[in-house]
Each structure stands twice: as structure tokens, then as C-alpha cells.
Swiss-Prot record:
It holds the Pfam family UDG. Belongs to the uracil-DNA glycosylase (UDG) superfamily. Type 5 (UDGb) family. GO terms for biological process: base-excision repair. Keywords: 4Fe-4S, DNA damage, DNA repair, Hydrolase, Iron, Iron-sulfur, Metal-binding. Residues 1-29 are annotated as: Disordered. This is Type-5 uracil-DNA glycosylase. Disulfide bonds: none annotated. InterPro entries: UDG_Type-4/5 (IPR051536), UdgB-like (IPR044147), Uracil-DNA_glycosylase-like (IPR005122), Uracil-DNA_glycosylase-like_sf (IPR036895).
Amino acid sequence: MHPKTGRAFRSPVEPGSGWPGDPATPQTPVAADAAQVSALAGGAGSICELNALISVCRACPRLVSWREEVAVVKRRAFADQPYWGRPVPGWGSKRPRLLILGLAPAAHGANRTGRMFTGDRSGDQLYAALHRAGLVNSPVSVDAADGLRANRIRITAPVRCAPPGNSPTPAERLTCSPWLNAEWRLVSDHIRAIVALGGFAWQVALRLAGASGTPKPRFGHGVVTELGAGVRLLGCYHPSQQNMFTGRLTPTMLDDIFREAKKLAGIE
């Protein structure tokens, strides 16, 4: 049973079956390979359409197998809950001034809840910091029906499926990249700041914004660089359990990043 709605769902969740916030229907086209990802992403005319297409993608066999196996086997703590078990679209404003880039959904976090950074400890830290900065309406993000709202921010990732060992292959990253390219195309006119959670997200942000020059700006926590067109990129260590437990990243450090990002993005 879904922990908020009390409805029963199969794991993985079938498109159009009533899951909170499910953007897809049984008729949503399904990308089965890299070429179809590129074609469908390139033709998406709105964030709503793009989210639906992303959420049913089956282009990477290893990722499809893993995300669905996790959804069926489950973690003991969530054995009584349905798992989303599908690709996770971006979440937040359709006209964001601040874009937050991660890496990929967590197996028992977003792969379970269907919303970016929701249902795991990394997300707990992230959303608490976003709330302290006035960028979301609640410090808690537990499921897709909890009423969380974004204040001119969007959270997304370059890989949409939970990968084994939290490590997508280079080929999987490449296959998935048209989804993020399309998302950037649809929101970039509004973006004034990007927060990259980790070095890979930093490199992706530089590519998205078409950063030129040699050498490229290097990732570091608190590093800020100008991407052109009035967009600033901020580096932030990923709020992983390891980084938080070891003190490499602290709540105060997160607060500093998001206060600065909010200021640079011009969010009230």
C-alpha cells in the first residue's frame, strides 16, 4: 500500500495506474534504445511531455533489470510499500531560476518514491537545507504525495534510473543524456544559477551550458564560475551519507551554498 494514499500498486508501478504525480499514461511512447531516446527527447515540447517520456524509458537493459529487481525484492524496512521502479523525471518548477543537478536516483530512495532525492538520507539533508533557504515549503520529503512545493527551483539528474552500485556506465550516461539536454532546452531561458552536487554533475553542467575556454573550471565545494548568459555555476559536495557522516559536508556548508545560490538566482 502507498504510505500516503493507502492505495495498492504493483511494483514496479504501471504508467497511468494512479501513482501520485505519475506523468505517464499507458499510451506514452516508450524509448527502447539510444536512438529512440534521442528522437523522443528531441521532440518533447513541454516539461510535462518530457517527464512522461522519461518515466517509461527502457533503453538501458542493465538499468531496467536492476531498478525492477530492487522494486520487487525491496528493502526490509519498506517491504510493505510499493516501489516506483521506473526512471525518475526532474522535479520542481517548470520555470526555475535555480537548477540543482545530482547524479542518479537511489535504489531505495527515488526508485521507491518516484521523486528526485526523496526517501533517502541524502534527500533528507538536501531538502532540509532547501527549506532553511526558503526554496521548498517543508523540511521533509518522504513521498510523492506529501505536498512538497518548490520555490523557483528544479532538481534533476543526468541519469534517470537507479544504477547498480550507484555507478552508471559511460554508455548508460551517454544514452540517458538526451533527456537532460531536452530538459535544459525547455527551462534554460529562466535559469540564473546551477548547483552541481559533485564532480560529475559539475562536468555535466559545463557541457549543458556550453562552457568554452581551456582549461575548464575545476570542481570544488564553494567554487563559483560564470557560464555566460548571466548563469552562475556553484560546486557543492554531494550530500551522501558518507560525506555527511565524515564531516566533509556539514549542514552549515549546505546552508552557505543554497543561500548563495538563492541570491545569485534572484529568488525572493
